[in-house]
Amino acid sequence: MLGISEQGFRRLEAYKMAQLTEPAFMIPVESSNVEAFGYVDEDQTLFVDFLAKGNSAGSRYVYYEVEPEVYSQFMASPSKGSFIWTHLRDRYDYEKLR
């Protein structure tokens, strides 16, 4: 894989997916913190668009290796922001994409 680790390659693919697949990929939600989310089963990546706050633009984060069961719990959660804070933020690798 051209000197890149498998994990690095998967992250690059997730990043490209996030850049190329805008509206159809993301599912909008009614939330005070989260605008939309999307999940890719093949590499277990969860994308989350957070709402803009004040003068700050909204941001997109990607969470890596989120198991399908955890994604199902996230979808069923009445508070997406609280779920991210308590179940994802300190347990999964993540990064800000924009």
Description of each model-found segment:
Residues 2-98:
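Acidic/histidine-enriched, beta-strand-rich ligand/metal-binding domains
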